[in-house]
Curated annotation (Swiss-Prot):
This is Small ribosomal subunit protein uS15. It comes from the Bacteria. SUPFAM superfamilies: S15/NS1 RNA-binding domain. One of the primary rRNA binding proteins, it binds directly to 16S rRNA where it helps nucleate assembly of the platform of the 30S subunit by binding and bridging several RNA helices of the 16S rRNA.
Length: 89
């Protein structure tokens, strides 16, 4: 259910702001989006898993706050990020 190290490395190579970037807001949003997608698929198969649903809602809230921060700092970067990730907002 969680991301493997290789999946994280692929996301890091795609969304890094600079070469040694491991925790920028863009990268955090990309990782959260991948985890949210996986958890959504899990919940479609297991609708009574309420603990996972709560975790999903927490992740969605964290991603929303990070996206708000990015939008406040640089709206052009925000627009390109949500297009690249395929997020509707």
């Amino acid at each position: 259910m969680s991301l493997t190290a290789s999946e994280k490395q692929v996301l890091m190579s795609e969304y890094q702001v600079h070469e040694t970037d491991t925790g920028s807001a863009d990268l955090q949003v990309a990782i959260l989006t991948k985890r949210i997608t996986q958890l959504t698929d899990h919940l479609k198969q297991n609708p009574k898993d309420h603990a996972s649903r709560r975790g999903l809602l927490k992740m969605i809230g964290r991603r929303r706050r990070l996206l708000g921060y990015i939008n406040k700092k640089d709206s052009n970067r925000y627009q390109t990020l949500i297009k690249r990730l395929g997020i509707r907002r």
